[in-house]
Regions:
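Accessory RNA-recognition modules of RNA-modification enzymes
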Residues: 1-163
Length: 163
């Protein structure tokens, strides 16, 4: 698997951050924050873009935090647990703004700040579970083609997890 050292720039849709290779090709990096230097492994390598995930953070951003959930990075349920909560809200606003401007062509749209939950954990009132091969419920592993059974989720309300 090809690894690159990358300088990240801004948030992108789906929880990734944009970096560019030496030719200016965008690389969408999972697990990074804007302004970081990371070592990343390519998972998709196309002529016009690539996808990668962080294997090592060489220079962390000040907004980086330790993920709360032991499944983070393996489970596909969360994108931003490696980011302090206030920055998570900012990232979501910036992604919506970018999508409306760059894809939608709407330049003068005011995007209000995202309203956060009073609780940084166990706030989600819905979850998109899939059945595992054994009949349990879980989340899809990123970069793998199987569902990971989850007994506890750091962002989902505990009552939902009793299903």
């Amino acid at each position: 698997m090809t690894e690159l050292v990358l300088q990240t720039t801004n948030y992108a849709f789906g929880g990734s951050v944009v970096a560019r290779d030496q030719n200016g090709r965008p690389i969408f990096v999972q697990g990074a924050l804007p302004g970081e230097t990371v070592r990343a492994a390519l998972t998709v390598d196309k002529d016009r873009f690539a996808h990668a995930y962080v294997t090592e953070v060489l220079e962390p951003a000040p907004e980086r935090s330790v993920p709360h959930c032991p499944h983070y990075g393996h489970c596909g349920g969360c994108h931003y647990q490696h980011v302090v909560y206030e920055e998570q809200l900012r990232a979501k606003r910036l992604v919506v703004q970018d999508q409306l401007q760059r894809i939608g062509g709407l330049k003068d749209v005011e995007i209000l700040p995202v309203l956060g939950s009073p609780e940084a954990w166990e706030y989600a009132q819905e979850a998109a579970f899939s059945p595992t091969a054994g009949g349990d419920l879980g989340y899809w592993f990123p970069r793998q083609r199987e569902v990971m059974p989850i007994e506890a989720c750091s962002i989902t309300r505990p009552r939902i997890m009793t299903l």
